[in-house]
Structures are given as structure tokens and as C-alpha cells.
């Protein structure tokens, strides 16, 4: 987890860190006095009054606060918090974060939900892809997720996978971006309208 905002980290009841990963551009970081540090190892080891020490963005030490260095360039006192390795989200569609509250899609089954939202998703723009990526990744980061695999399969109006990747770099969560495509619109037996960008996704895939 990149610690971009100390205050945000201090007010999050559960703080997650990716073991062995870059977490911020700084010289040293000391996390100490966490109520519990959950290692998530094979034995389920939990360390009371735990913490970690990182140098140049790489975690070097994990253990009881008493066993860690006394100071660092940045020090986080996490009393009342739980520290754990970062969570991994293995399946996401980040662009859908923009359409959660569409009335016609509430309480619908999957196919009717898709039929309702495909026309809206067909109006996605490069900017909308970027914003939805950042909204979704920031929400994941605040809930302890440090890695996400996203499946983007609609590319209308000039949208590209690159738009998502560039936007994700500003957040700091690891992103495994994957590109899908659809070749069948509604007239051919598929779910999305023919003009929703599904055919465009095939053209983009073939072009690249």
C-alpha cells in the first residue's frame, strides 16, 4: 500500500501493507504499536503491539515494536489499528463504479442488469474510464486492497486500456489490467446493443 496521506492512514481502522513491495518514495518508514499485526503466514501468526520497518520503499523488518528501530524518517503510530498484508482483488470491472445507482438496474437479475446498463456504458469516454479507475482503486485501497486485477472489455468513443493504466499510476495500487472484447451485439444474439462499443472492442483488439 502506498502511504500517500498520513492522516488517511491514521484514521483507517485497518491498515494494509504489501510485504516486500514498494510503498512510497521515502528513505525509511517505521510503523509501530499496532494493536495487532496479522502476518497471514501458514500458522496464522498475530503479533500484539506489532509493526514494521521499511527502507527505500521495501519492507525489511516485521515484528514486535520493541524489536524494531526506534525511529525513521516517517513514523506511524497505529495504536488501535490492525496491520495486515495487502488484500488482492482478483476480479473487477472498475468502469462499472460509475453506474451503481442507476434506478432501472437496482435489484435486477444479471441479464436485465446488463441490458439496462450497456447503453450507458456505450457512452463511456477516455475520461470516464480514467475517473472510474481512480474511484474504484481508491475505494479498494481504503479497504486494505493493494493489488487488483481489472477486466475492461468496452472501448467506445476512443477509450483505450492505456487510459486506465495511466490513471491507475496516480493512485499507487498495483493494477493487473486485462483487456477483453465482445464480437456479438444484440442483433446477433448478444446482450449489448450493436452500437454500445462491443464491436469497437474487437477492432481495438485487432488493431493493437
Where are these regions (language model features)?
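Aromatic (phenylalanine/tyrosine) cluster motif
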Residues: 17-19
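Alpha-helical scaffold segments that flank or form the walls of functional sites
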Residues: 22, 100-151, 156-173, 208
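N-terminal metal-binding scaffold of metallo-dependent hydrolase/deaminase domains
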Residues: 22-70, 82
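Hydrophobic faces of well-ordered beta-strands that scaffold small-molecule active sites
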Residues: 88-90, 148-150, 175-179
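Metal-coordinating catalytic core of metallo-dependent amide/deamination hydrolases
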Residues: 159-208
Amino acid at each position: 500500500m502506498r502511504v500517500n496521506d498520513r492522516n488517511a492512514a491514521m484514521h483507517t481502522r485497518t491498515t494494509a501493507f504489501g510485504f516486500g513491495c514498494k510503498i512510497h518514495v521515502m528513505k525509511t518508514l517505521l510503523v509501530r504499536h499496532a494493536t495487532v499485526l496479522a502476518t497471514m503466514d501458514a500458522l496464522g501468526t498475530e503479533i500484539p503491539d506489532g509493526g514494521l520497518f521499511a527502507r527505500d520503499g521495501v519492507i525489511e523488518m516485521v515484528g514486535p515494536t520493541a524489536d524494531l528501530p526506534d525511529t525513521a524518517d516517517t513514523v506511524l503510530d497505529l495504536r488501535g489499528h490492525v496491520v495486515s498484508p495487502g488484500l488482492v482483488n482478483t476480479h473487477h470491472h472498475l468502469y462499472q463504479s460509475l453506474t451503481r445507482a442507476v434506478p432501472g438496474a437496482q435489484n435486477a437479475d444479471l441479464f436485465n442488469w446488463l441490458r439496462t446498463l450497456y447503453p450507458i456504458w456505450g457512452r463511456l469516454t477516455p475520461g470516464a474510464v480514467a475517473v472510474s479507475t481512480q474511484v474504484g482503486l481508491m475505494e479498494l485501497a481504503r479497504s486494505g486492497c493493494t493489488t487488483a486485477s481489472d477486466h475492461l472489455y468496452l472501448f467506445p468513443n476512443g477509450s483505450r486500456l492505456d487510459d486506465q493504466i495511466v490513471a491507475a499510476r496516480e493512485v499507487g495500487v498495483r493494477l493487473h489490467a486485462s483487456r477483453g472484447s465482445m464480437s456479438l451485439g444484440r442483433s446477433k444474439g448478444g446482450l449489448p446493443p450493436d452500437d454500445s462499443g462491443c464491436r469497437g472492442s474487437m477492432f481495438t483488439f485487432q488493431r493493437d
